A protein has these predicted regions:
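An amphipathic, hydrophobic-aromatic interaction surface with interspersed Lys/Arg
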Residues: 1-286, 296-302
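The alpha-helix within a helix-turn-helix
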Residues: 289
Length: 303
């Protein structure tokens, strides 16, 4: 939370990450954010609406009260009414300026770099885990823990990739429902009862899970390819079927149902074993990189 001292001495607490929102605030944010992403809502409008919800500030009621009071003063004391009108104008400008600054400081959902919108995909856990039974979890605290399976992750990655193939709202909703079905162990028909905020928010959270592995100093090699464009041997880029086959040939069983972290570790071990074997046979690092699709830097780290 970000603490801001107000003029009256009270402290305003503004969230700086997704996990600091209440359930109601989270759903409201996930309702509006797709419109921001689609360019149908200004980022500042999102920030202002969330600020008003978080603070409970209701500007319309205050303006109405002041207009009524000023009308009463015009009837009883015109001179004071004129002074009050100017005071209200200055107060309104001050309040508006403060609202703008506070709203623009809300960055739990995204950051703005000029006109570029950078979404925040970081969640300490699935924000909807308490709303949906049998939800996939991915907890990031002192250590990372998950109940997600290799199959759930792989299918989820494929579905996220499909989102880019069609821009129509109907297609996006279809893919988001399929993704939620995978991650919440639901049938496709059962996802019809999930709010749009949960569907979109689930995709945002899962994108953060994928991002975690892509940016990880070790697991990241499973997603990287060399400039030659070939797939990394034993890596995630091969596709689920080939990865399962490779791991099962190496002695692993029921790979699709493996815990996601165990699945990732198994792939890393398989790659390291293959690289070590090639190096022992005298194959140069550059040749290993060319064959496997790994970068030379990744190969050198494993030799």
């Amino acid at each position: 939370m970000k603490d801001i001292m107000l003029c009256d001495g009270s402290m305003l607490h503004l969230p700086t990450e997704w996990g600091e929102l209440t359930g109601e605030q989270l759903l409201r944010a996930m309702d509006m954010l797709p419109f921001v992403v689609a360019g149908e809502m200004e980022p500042f409008d999102f920030q202002l609406q969330m600020l008003l919800m978080i603070t409970g500030y209701r500007p319309d009621r205050r303006r109405l009260w002041r207009r009524l009071r000023r009308a009463w003063l015009w009837l009883t004391n015109p001179i004071e009414a004129m002074a009050q009108k100017e005071l209200d104008r200055l107060r309104s400008e001050y309040v508006t300026c403060n609202l703008v600054r506070l709203a623009e400081s809300l960055n739990f959902a995204f950051e703005l770099n000029g006109s570029e919108l950078k979404l925040n995909y970081y969640f300490t856990d699935n924000p909807f885990a308490d709303m949906v039974k049998d939800a996939a979890r991915f907890t990031r605290r002192m250590t990372v823990e998950t109940n997600m399976t290799a199959r759930q992750f792989s299918d989820g990655v494929d579905l996220l990739s499909n989102l880019k193939s069609d821009d129509t709202p109907e297609f996006h909703t279809h893919i988001l429902r399929r993704l939620s079905a995978v991650l919440y162990n639901l049938s496709y028909d059962e996802t019809a009862g999930l709010p749009g905020a949960v569907l979109f928010g689930t995709s945002l959270w899962f994108t953060g899970v994928v991002q975690y592995f892509k940016e990880h100093p070790v697991y990241g090699m499973l997603f990287r390819k060399s400039e030659s464009g070939t797939s990394s041997g034993g890596g995630i880029a091969l596709g689920m079927g080939e990865v399962i086959l490779s791991l099962e040939k190496s002695g692993y069983h029921n790979v699709a149902a493996m815990n996601l972290l165990e699945f990732m570790d198994a792939q890393i071990k398989l790659i390291k074993d293959n690289v070590a074997k090639a190096a022992a046979e005298g194959v140069k690092a550059g040749e290993i990189a060319s064959r496997s699709g790994l970068s030379i830097a990744d190969v050198i780290k494993m030799i």
